[in-house]
Every structure is written in C-alpha cells, then in structure tokens.
C-alpha cells in the first residue's frame, strides 16, 4: 500500500522542480524579433540532471505573423536548409516522426488548409492479436483561420479533405482490415478538424489543462520505456490567452544536458502555462532555429538532422 504514496511524492517533487527552473529572457540573442515573440533560455538542473532548454512564446493573434508548415516532398532537409528554402522565416522547428528509409512523414502535416502528409492508420498486432490490426489515433496541434490553436487525436483518410478529430480522448480500436476507414474505429464522437496549419507527433502531453500523456493509447513505441527515458525533446502547446509555446530541450550529453522524460516535459509545458500540449519528434531530430540561429545543440552526431517536415513562423506578406 506504500507504492501510491511514493509515486505521489515523486509527482509533486517533479512538479516543484520544474516550477523552480530559472528561465532567462534571450530575445537579444536572436534579434530582431517582433514584440509578439519572446525567447527564453534555461541552463539549470532538473531532478538532479543537467538541463538546457529554450522556449518561444508567440502571440497567435499577431496578423503580422504567419504560422505554417513545409515538407521536403519526399526529401529530407536540415532546419537550416528549410530556413534558406523558405526565405528566412523567424522560426523553424522539427515536428513529425518519419521513416529514415523512405523519408515519409508518419504524422499529419497541413499547410494552407491542405493535408500534405497523413497519419499511420494501421499497425500489425502482436501476440494474441497477431492476426489483427491496431488503428491508432495520434496527437496533432493545429491553428485554424481564426488563429485559434487546438490539440486533438486524429485519424486521417487520404480521400478526405480534413482529418477526423477526437477531442475528448484517443480511440483505441483493432480489427481485421489492413486499410481501415473511420467506421473501423467504432466511435461516432468525431468532428472534422478544419485547420489551416497543423503538425502531428505524439504523444499528447496536456489535455484540457491537465497532464495526460497518452503514448500507450496512441500506440507509440510499444514495449519500450519511452516515457521514462531521458532524451532531447521538442514540444508545442498553447495557452488560454492565445500564445503558442514551442519548447526544445537539449540532451544526450550527460555532463552538460541529459534531456528529460515525457513526464518532466509535460510538467515543464504545464508550468509555462499550456492548456494543451503535444510532444513532437525528439532525440537527434530536436532542433529549434530563431532567425536562423540554433538554440539547443542538436544531439545527432552530424549536427542538424535532415527531416521531412518542419513548422514555421514567418512574416506575413
């Protein structure tokens, strides 16, 4: 009967530690920036591990700014190459998971209201379910035409213009169809997710103002201790007062920056005021550029890892 108490103490200790992180404004290091964008840095310790991170806070209603995404159209480019190809945006950050073999994005990407990439819709079952398929609904963050952000669990269909969104919870379903439709999920509580810009990843970290890490429900990394591993991380969320929060955490440098667990990442996003938040691809992919300058140091041995998609903040022309 003592275990729940121990876990509760750990949870509150972790929450207290993230709340005590010492963030310093770093706008001047990445100038010039509009008044609606601020950059913060932190070089501290977190739960006994060295910690380095940066985050940006961007006002969504600033009509001088454009929030968009771009893909490599079957190729992969480094964030710096996207910065050059996209004519020097204010911000570039990695986002979706992908295949190293095919360069395919494995999550939804929406640009100008058009889906450029789709989620994985079926995964082969294992063990007793080896003859079945799992149908994951994975997290994404989007911004609509009114510049309102949302995080939802999605099912995508390349024959449909919009993703199917589940706002209350991820759907966990399985069946015999290798190419499922929305009806394979046996859930009618969905809506069309009409976003102008969106990027996918997973798992969701915060839902309706509370930590809810849904990596098991999203069927991410089954069998791995993904939740408890210290890794470089990228996350994106939004606040109730209309600010987009983009977080990049350095890692895989034990004496300099250890990275964080998913629980720690969620606590950080909550402490930054996020009402909802999403984990994005991390590890060697984590990279955040402000005005073309690196914030965290990427952990990939070659430097910035080429990725097939990025999220961008640009000047609105």
Regions found by a protein language model. Give the residues of each.
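A short catalytic or substrate-binding loop motif that flags glycine-/basic-rich loops and adjacent residues
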Residues: 46-50, 132-135, 197, 226-230, ...
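Short glycine-rich loop/turn motifs
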Residues: 50-55, 138, 200-202, 231-235, ...
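Short, glycine-/Ser/Thr-/acidic-enriched flexible segments
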Residues: 61-63, 98, 148, 156, ...
């Amino acid at each position: 009967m003592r275990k729940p108490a121990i876990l509760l103490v750990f949870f509150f200790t972790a929450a207290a530690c993230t709340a005590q992180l010492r963030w310093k404004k770093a706008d001047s290091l990445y100038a010039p920036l509009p008044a609606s964008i601020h950059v913060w840095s932190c070089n501290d310790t977190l739960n006994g591990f060295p910690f380095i991170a940066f985050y940006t806070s961007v006002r969504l209603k600033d009509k001088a700014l454009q929030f968009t995404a771009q893909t490599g159209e079957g190729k992969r480019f480094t964030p710096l190459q996207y910065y050059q190809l996209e004519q020097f945006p204010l911000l570039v950050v990695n986002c979706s998971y992908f295949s190293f073999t095919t360069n395919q994005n494995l999550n939804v990407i929406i640009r100008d209201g058009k889906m450029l990439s789709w989620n994985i819709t079926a995964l082969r079952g294992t063990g007793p379910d080896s003859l079945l398929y799992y149908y994951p609904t994975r997290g994404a963050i989007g911004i609509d035409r009114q510049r309102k952000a949302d995080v939802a669990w999605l099912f995508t269909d390349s024959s449909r213009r919009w993703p199917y969104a589940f706002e209350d919870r991820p759907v966990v379903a399985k069946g015999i169809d290798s190419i499922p439709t929305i009806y394979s999920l046996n859930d009618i509580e969905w809506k069309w997710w009409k976003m102008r810009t969106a990027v996918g990843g997973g798992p969701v970290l915060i839902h309706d103002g509370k930590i809810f890490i849904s990596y098991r429900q999203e069927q991410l990394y089954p069998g791995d201790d993904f939740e408890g591993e210290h890794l470089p991380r990228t996350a994106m969320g939004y606040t109730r007062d209309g600010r987009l929060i983009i977080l990049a955490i350095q890692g895989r440098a034990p004496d300099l920056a250890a990275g964080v667990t998913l629980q720690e990442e969620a606590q950080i996003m909550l402490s930054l005021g996020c009402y909802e938040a999403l984990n994005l691809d991390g590890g060697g992919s984590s990279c955040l550029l402000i005005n073309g300058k690196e914030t965290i140091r990427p952990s990939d041995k070659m430097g910035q890892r080429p990725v097939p998609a990025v999220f961008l903040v640009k000047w609105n022309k």
